[in-house]
């Protein structure tokens, strides 16, 4: 399949510990409902997977969506339905939010199937290291193990809510078992990648996420 430019949009949420679980469920449900907007090519939202050894800086939930163009992303961002969900369901329960957008060349379908596992890495490159980091990630994509069904990476073009993080990397796996098997069985490869990118980074955030089933249709 020929590579197609796709706009990646990822948002990390940190829900307050004291939040009523029903309000958290409402936030997730309403975020998932945004998949029905015409401009959205793919959208999934839910809790990040607990990983004590990962640098997630306390973020509890993730939204990942894809768009056919920057114009579609802009239309989503300003859509009244999206604005209402943010105002009514997100801001009242979250103590921290960050977001990143980048352009990715995908050579596989835009929508990640339900049950897929994702590992999202947000990187804050050292000064002057962004170009070298993205070039390194291009090599990582080429050498990705068979368990990885899709790799997306790129330089953030929306700095306002990114807290200085400038590069995103998203690896998609067939399922959670494949992701965990890679961690266990491909340690040399994982460490090799870390050795290449660590000198280029000021800091990074890593979260794992499982793509949920699509929201049930309403009649």
Placement of each model-derived feature along the sequence:
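A short mixed-secondary-structure module that forms the rim of ligand-binding clefts
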Residues: 78-82, 86
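A short beta-strand-loop micro-motif that forms or neighbors metal/cofactor-
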Residues: 89
């Amino acid at each position: 399949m020929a590579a197609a430019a796709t706009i990646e949009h990822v948002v990390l949420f940190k829900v307050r510990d004291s939040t009523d679980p029903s309000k958290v469920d409402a936030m997730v449900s309403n975020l998932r409902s945004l998949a029905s907007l015409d401009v959205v090519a793919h959208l999934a939202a839910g809790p990040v997977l607990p990983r004590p050894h990962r640098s997630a800086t306390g973020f509890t939930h993730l939204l990942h969506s894809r768009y056919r163009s920057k114009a579609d992303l802009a239309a989503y961002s300003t859509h009244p339905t999206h604005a209402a969900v943010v105002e009514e369901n997100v801001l009242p329960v979250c103590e921290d939010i960050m977001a990143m957008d980048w352009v990715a060349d995908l050579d596989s379908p835009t929508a990640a199937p339900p049950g897929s596992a994702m590992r999202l890495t947000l990187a804050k490159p050292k000064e002057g290291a962004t170009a070298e980091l993205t070039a390194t990630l291009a090599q990582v994509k080429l050498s990705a193990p068979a368990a990885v069904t899709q790799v997306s990476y790129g330089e953030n073009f929306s700095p306002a809510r990114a807290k200085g993080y400038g590069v995103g990397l998203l690896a998609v796996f067939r399922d959670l078992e494949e992701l965990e098997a890679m961690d266990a069985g491909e340690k040399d490869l994982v460490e090799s990648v870390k050795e290449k990118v660590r000198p280029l980074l000021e800091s990074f955030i890593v979260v794992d996420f499982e793509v949920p089933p699509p929201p049930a249709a309403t009649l």
